[in-house]
């Protein structure tokens, strides 16, 4: 069994960096997760910090921010709220559950409201 695993690693079939890159790409583009949630899930799979960081570097910053804004706009149309503060709280909880950073969330919510 060890020989088989060693052979797979040598032939680049088992590659942590490639896995991290594919995982990041899929979760970001398909599920529209943020960096925090992606990092947490990769850590649960015991992927090294180096591989995680290399995978996360592949996310285009402009596309990342566009995803954040698109998610907020879509959710904003779908939720019902008693007042402005309730709406903002629901939007913030939703987008943070997707794994986006607090600072980016605050900036995006400010832009959405103003």
Predicted regions and their residues:
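An alpha-helical, amphipathic repeat domain used for nucleic-acid recognition
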Residues: 1-114
């Amino acid at each position: 069994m060890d020989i088989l695993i060693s052979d797979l690693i040598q032939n680049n079939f088992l590659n942590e960096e490639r896995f991290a890159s594919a995982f990041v790409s899929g979760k970001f583009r398909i599920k529209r997760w943020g960096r925090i949630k992606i990092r947490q899930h990769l850590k649960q799979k015991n992927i090294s910090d180096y591989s995680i960081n290399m995978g996360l570097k592949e996310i285009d910053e402009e596309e990342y921010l566009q995803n954040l804004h698109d998610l907020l706009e879509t959710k904003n149309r779908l939720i019902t709220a008693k007042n402005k503060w309730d709406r903002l709280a629901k939007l913030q909880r939703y987008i943070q559950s997707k794994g986006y950073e607090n600072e980016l969330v605050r900036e995006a919510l400010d832009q959405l409201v103003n």
